[in-house]
């Protein structure tokens, strides 16, 4: 249980077998045959405890983190903290008590996560009887070793419990010698502790074998002359130990255990039934064991009169309709055996519940290997690949069965398999639901709307995965496919996706171990995409495009199954030891399913038949052809290559209906989303902003974000010229996005719902344009995924911040850091609990030219020295949860690699960030204005004043007309600016950008003011969005530069170009 080796690892990777980290390369274990090594001189076997005899702390930590929603790796990182002098190592040398360890350990974890971590709960789980049980395969091996006259020992890095007894949940009678670090004051890999163990055994190093799960401990033992075995999983380690000792250590049936008391069946009546079935006259005893796998239908091993059998039965109690259909299992296996599909030989189906309590069937036992760990520890990479190839091949064989030839044409309904399955699993889930799981609710709504258009019909297994296959002990050959309970006729791609579940689950997932955190290339295991291509090649099919849908559906099924197991565990019906854990796992798996639904939404959008952006007539700038610039190409630089006098071959797109078909379809999809999702949610969102919980993100907003992702309405803002490969965004031009931005602007909440809100949009564009790959990986990706938020710190209270060169905050170089000092205010979004990044602008060289004095740094919000002085209000509005803060930066130390683009480039970065952002602001303002005018028109039609409707009043009519004219004027001007940016770049559009920034906010203020006037006092209330519209329209008259600055810019450019 030592973590010492981790301190010496160059990448600080833990090698505990079931941690959430990559597997290391396993040694070659050779053949599975037992070979007697004649002349063996081994006289003792020495065992580590954690990871060898009982589950390792890493495995327990990973399980506990999942169940308690603690970020994976937290416990291991805290255990590693401090190296030899850290609390964990001192605890194992008995230098501190359990109480002292938990106090220091808890402090470390809490500092990492900035919140309290219940480490007592982890320690209780680690030392509990439920977890700290000796592996049966090791118990059996120790028994056989001692029966042969060899000594056994435990050599463990261990600790004292609060009762002052060492943690040793083992039968001490199994061992001749026990050496524990807490009793000796030294830990592995200190050579003294190995020598002490050998001295107590009275042996030389070469006469012993040492088993440990940590490479560093084994290395020191090997240096002393002890033979070592690396334990990646107990069963594989026992096989290697058998080869070294030359005799068998396992005499039982693999993967079985004594029958649980709640799963016992009457032996007498079963024995009578089997004697009649098999014609057996013997009076010998019936041996009955229970298989570890098969949590849905209890499965038993039976030995009677030299016959090895397997019995599968329905679980007891009231069951969901159509579930646990063992009758169908019997029928399908009997039919497929005649079609060359490897299945066990079934003998009889007994539907008489009086025999053992529920219906069951009996089949012959098929000896072989069942690989419960999909990483296949102990095998060569080539053998692992061969195993997965064989798995793929047998799946193709199942899907190629002639239904009519084997009499299975009525085994299920033909066609519409996925729709029926969705309905079935929704029904099953609802029947076993114990609480509301948001991701499941979203999937229940999403799946029926995204069904595959074309489906083939074959036999489908329904639960096809590696641990439902029996393999030949020595060859990569499938001997039998098990667990046919969910089989039917349906879409074969559902089987293919289901067989890839492990590729997306962590290795420590309690119910189905995964390989998501393994290096598949190193292991030799095909990635999910390669596995799917392999299947398509064998079946002669083109690859499907909607792979993500099938994965979403598969994980949705798993979540529904886990929920059913959990519900049955509450009544004692489920047979698996994992059943009670599945309550929390259902939510984990449903979130995975939703992730695939989101990916499918992105795929649908990105694979729309967009016209090549380089040849769109409405934004491609046709330049004179030259040898350096082929016809139709375009530079993505913001520097114009010719005069804006050159016009494009297409016109300005002034209406959404004139957009290209795919973008027009996107616009209408967004409009439908706004009408169906966003507008109806506004009252609840407004109530949240006024509630005591307003400084926490609204759960409804988060739910709407997930729905927007799934609909492909996410990250639409990045302009094509900044992201020409569409790597990060939708690849829209400024004009295309302007129309969508206006639509989002009709609601205060829509930009955030679609991840298109400031200041994140500007910061993400900054990172795309100027960030290093490391900066993008650290900050851009979480922002794009909506997992983090950010702020931009430029405005200062002591200077006119409209002139960026006035910035006084200092950035001083010190060793490998920059030290920041400064006073900022009106920092939008800094109060948001999700804000993880502050993009900070400060002065690095006050003696440089004015436009080269400023620099931009990426500052993590958890950096010491950032002090929020107070929140600021706008006309009394707090704008929670993001808010606007006044902040001091006092001696804030930031690594040099957090500098953006380089020292002295801050002004350039700020200007580059503002160009598209001003288009966004202005189009949102036009959205404000359109919504305000629509509300005004509806209001004046329904109100009477002085005996006639308001709509008939002359002044009201004049206001409506004036508002319409001003909106249209502003829209045309903004679209023209966006069009020019698409054609010639930001610099060439500087005049137009300045004009729209001085026009749009003033226009919006006037239009909204007229609407408020028409509403009267109601217009000032939070019952309508008008008051907030007006607030932000007014604020934008100086945000991103005051109107006066833009008027001056326009005048200077006018004089420069026109005189």
Curated annotation (Swiss-Prot):
Widely expressed with highest expression in fetal brain, followed by heart, muscle, kidney and adult brain. Expression levels varying from isoform to isoform. The keyword Oxidoreductase applies. The keyword Ion transport does not apply. FAD binds at residues 792-802, 828, 943, 1013, 1044. GO terms for biological process: fatty acid beta-oxidation; fatty acid beta-oxidation using acyl-CoA dehydrogenase. One of its GO terms (molecular function) is flavin adenine dinucleotide binding. Keywords: Acetylation, FAD, Flavoprotein, Oxidoreductase. Its EC number is 1.3.99.-. Acyl-CoA dehydrogenase only active with R- and S-2-methyl-C15-CoA. PANTHER family: AMINOGLYCOSIDE PHOSPHOTRANSFERASE DOMAIN-CONTAINING PROTEIN, HYDROLASE, PUTATIVE (AFU_ORTHOLOGUE AFUA_1G12880)-RELATED. This is Acyl-CoA dehydrogenase family member 10. It comes from Homo sapiens (Human).
